[in-house]
């Protein structure tokens, strides 16, 4: 075979023996090119592109789960059947993982969503007293510091130079 005089170099790969034919049979193969995109693009990856791709992968996984659930139910009611099957799938996954079922956690709202008890209005003086009580031992006029500091340590020390 003749090699074309092209600016691209072609690589020749010897083929194995076919039907006991010639051992030195060679065929021309397409030129070994590197990925053009990897050559032309910068090595810095745009974070937004990666996030979008990951998000799309998550969407695809969810769509596949929905298809699998709908196939398993046999075309039952889309609302109730799929929901029950989803719970069943979650339970099975938990059993495989060996962990406890997290179904109870899902039924209860997170602590941040729970309503806090109604607050009582307190005077500023009472609030200051309570905060001081946590950090200091307050006893009428005497204040002992719980942190281990005394008033002398808090005041800047004065040095007397003669």
From Swiss-Prot:
Any one cellular-component term (Gene Ontology): condensed nuclear chromosome
Region described as Disordered: 67-124
Signal peptide positions (record): none
Keyword DNA repair assigned: yes
Keywords assigned: Chromosome, DNA damage, DNA recombination, DNA repair, Meiosis, Nucleus
Source organism superkingdom: Eukaryota
GO process terms (BP): DNA recombination; DNA repair; negative regulation of DNA recombinase mediator complex assembly; negative regulation of mitotic recombination; synaptonemal complex assembly
Keyword Nucleus attributed: yes
Ranges annotated as biased composition (Basic and acidic residues): 85-94
Function as written in the Swiss-Prot or TrEMBL entry: Involved in regulation of meiotic recombination and repair of DNA damage. Inhibits RAD51-mediated recombination when the meiotic recombination machinery is impaired.
UniProt name for this protein: Meiosis-specific protein HED1
Organism phylogeny: Eukaryota, Fungi, Dikarya, Ascomycota, Saccharomycotina
């Amino acid at each position: 075979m003749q090699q074309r005089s092209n600016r691209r170099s072609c690589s020749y790969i010897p083929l194995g023996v076919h039907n006991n034919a010639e051992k030195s049979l060679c065929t021309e193969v397409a030129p070994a090119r590197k990925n053009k995109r990897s050559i032309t693009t910068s090595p810095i990856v745009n974070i937004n592109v990666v996030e979008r791709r990951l998000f799309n992968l998550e969407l695809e996984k969810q769509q596949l789960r929905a298809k699998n659930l709908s196939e398993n139910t046999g075309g039952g009611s889309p609302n109730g059947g799929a929901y029950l099957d989803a719970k069943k799938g979650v339970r099975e996954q938990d059993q495989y993982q060996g962990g406890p079922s997290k179904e109870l956690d899902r039924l209860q709202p997170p602590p941040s969503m729970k309503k806090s008890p109604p607050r009582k209005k307190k005077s500023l003086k009472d609030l200051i007293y309570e905060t001081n009580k946590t950090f200091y031992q307050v006893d009428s006029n005497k204040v002992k510091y719980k942190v281990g500091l005394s008033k002398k340590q808090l005041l800047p020390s004065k040095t007397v130079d003669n």
